[in-house]
Each structure stands twice: as C-alpha cells, then as structure tokens.
Regions:
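C-terminal/domain-edge helix-coil "capping" segments
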Residues: 20-41, 49, 143-203
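N-terminal segment of the mature soluble domain
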Residues: 41-115
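Short low-complexity stretches enriched in small and charged residues
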Residues: 27-31, 56-67, 126-129, 202-203
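Surface-exposed short loop/turn segments
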Residues: 85-160
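Bacterial N-terminal signal peptides that target proteins for export
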Residues: 1-8
Length: 203
C-alpha cells in the first residue's frame, strides 16, 4: 500500500470543513482495473492536526458505515497518537484492526462564493402632493444599500484503498459549507459518499 504516501503527504485540518450538513458530491472515480467485491471491514482515517476533530469525524463516519451494514473502525482507536502516522505505523494499524480497506479523507482547498444583492433604484418622492401621498411615496423611495454575502466552502477528497490492491480503487470529492457543528457536517458529508460507494458495490 505504498500509495498511502500520496494521501498522507499533506497533513491538513479537517476542522475547516465541518459545519452545517450542506454537502455536495461533485466528482467520483473508480479504478476500472479493480474487480474485487465489496470490502468487509473499513478503517476510517481523517487527516487533521486537531485530535478532537479527527475523533469526531472518524466516529461519525464509522457509525454511518455501520448503520449501512459495513463494519468500520476509527483509526484513532488503534493509533490514538496525535499528528501524522508513519506509513509503517498505518500499515500495522490496519493489520491490527483486521480491516481489509482504508478510507482516507483530506482537505483539498477552500472556496468562497460571493452573492451581491442590489435593490431596485429608489423612486423620488413627489413634491406636489398631500402629506399622506408624500408619506407613501417616501416609503416607495426608501433606499436599501447593496448587500454582499460570502459563503465559505471546503473541498475534500475521500479515497478508498483495498489492502491487497496496489492503487486506490475509488475516490470522491465533496464541497461542504463551513460551520462549527462537526458531527452534523460529517453526517451530511458521509451520506453521499457512502451511497456512491454502495452504488459501485465497493462496500
């Protein structure tokens, strides 16, 4: 499983992606050469510098996999140390857990969408009118400033490795809105991932 080096080369903080459960599966890929059936047990690995984030992510993702009939184990239950694991330690952890597959999630990039809301131009108040008419036209001409809203998203990549296969067998990319509710965001993020892997008969 030498390709773990690619997935583990960048230690990033998954904390940035977690928040509300707004998540979109934007792309998937499957190795056309892979002919194996569904995996039996998955080790879930979240790449994060924050131990609490990693644990919540791995726990939630593993729970959702188990809810779909897939045996899963969070990596921190085997390797509780914080920070990046060596490749040897990761391979030993996979063997110790009895998993035949590893699911690794990493952050790829942050994106910002900007939404500008421009109100209609104000209507000038009429000079030659009664006070009540002037009052009404004044409301019609009430000025609202242009509003600018920014929506922050994080793009993450989840890759499935099968222990006896030399290369990744599947990968999916999601775009998730930032927030602070780690568990809820992980649930929203994991749901389309699990559905896509089930569709491909990988889990």
């Amino acid at each position: 499983m030498s390709t773990f080096r690619i997935a583990l080369a960048t230690t990033v903080m998954l904390a940035a992606m977690y928040g509300c459960a707004t998540s979109e599966l934007t792309n998937t890929w499957k190795d056309p050469k892979y002919g194996g059936g569904p995996v039996k047990k998955v080790m879930v690995v979240g790449i994060s510098k924050q131990a609490s984030v990693r644990r919540t992510f791995e726990d939630t993702f593993a729970e959702m996999l188990r809810a779909k009939g897939v045996e899963a184990v969070p990596s921190y239950t085997v390797v509780p140390e914080e920070g990046q694991m060596t490749e040897d330690k990761l391979r030993a952890a996979v063997k110790q857990s009895g998993a035949d597959a590893v699911l690794i999630t990493r952050m790829v990039e942050k994106q910002t969408d900007t939404q500008v809301s421009a109100p209609p131009p104000p209507i000038g108040a009429y000079r030659r009118t009664s006070y009540s008419g002037y009052y009404s036209s004044a409301w019609a001409g009430y000025y609202e400033p242009v509003t600018v809203q920014e929506f922050h998203y994080v793009v993450t990549e989840t890759t499935l490795f099968v222990a006896e296969h030399p290369e990744p067998v599947w990968s999916g990319t999601t775009r998730t809105m930032e927030s602070n509710d780690i568990r809820a965001a992980t649930e929203g993020f994991a749901k389309p991932m699990i559905a896509a892997m089930k569709k491909e008969k990988l889990i």
